Amino acid sequence: MTTPQKVAMQPITVEFPLRGDWTAVHTPAEKVPSHGVDVLGQTYAYDFMKVDWGKDGFIFHDKSTLRFFTVGVSVNDCYGFGEPIYSPVKGEVVMVEDGLKDHRWVHPIKDFLAMLVRSLYMWLSNKPNLHKIIGNYFIVKIDGMEAYAFFAHTKKNSIKVNPGDKVQYGQHVANVGHTGNSSAPHLHFHLMDQPNLLTAHGLPCNFSEYKAFNDGVWVSKRYEMPAKREQICVKEA
């Protein structure tokens, strides 16, 4: 795997890939690389989760905190699980990997240990099975540029496109899942310069339009990157 050189680049503007209220738990608005590593083209990657803003703390499920830290919660009790993903770009699908089962339960300690094992496997293996690491995923080449949109951890058998398919802005392409190296249901999204994950370099992107809840009011945002744990919203078209 190559390590890309970080250089100043203008962000590519795309549409927001989700609808309703979400938050970015990892975002290049906070730091670059956003996930702490320059691998798999994820230098400028986002992780989006759905949480309950009416509860204290960062709560992404409808069970008690005690239950979460003891026995865990079912993936079906997590707010974002199964939510539709919409294409933020116009382009052609170049790769699809689906069929991996979603993790049935979410538990902070067990998930951390499982993610650690999978990460070590990727680093130590000469030919890592990326499907097991990334979960279900697909890649779209954006029309008119050498840029590729990458979507990961999608729900089993929810990807609605195949290699060679043309996708349009706002097209329902998959559903949020909990597959691969995932600690809770979320969408991992980033842009990169080629479809080969092992050699790809990340490309920055921002979003054409969304709203952010700041200081008690909703503020319209255009061509910006959401801040970490900022409440953001995109209404249905």
Which positions does each model-derived feature cover?
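Acidic, glycine-rich catalytic/binding loops that coordinate metals and/or anionic ligands
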Residues: T23, P33-H35, I59, P128-L130, ...
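Terminal presequence/propeptide segments associated with secretion/organelle targeting
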Residues: M1-P33, V39-G41, C233-A237
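Zn2+-dependent peptidoglycan hydrolase active-site motif and core
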Residues: K63-S64, T70-V71, M95-K155
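Short, small/polar residue-rich loop motifs at catalytic or cofactor-binding pockets
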Residues: Y79-F81, I133, I159-K160
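Short glycine-rich loop/turn motifs
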Residues: T43-A45, G82, I134-F138
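Short, charged beta-turn/beta-strand-edge "cap" motif at the junction between a beta-strand
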Residues: D98-K101, V173-S183
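A residue-level detector for short acidic-glycine micro-motifs
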Residues: H26, K50, M95, H153-K156, ...
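Short, well-structured beta-strand-loop connectors
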Residues: P84-M95, K160-V176
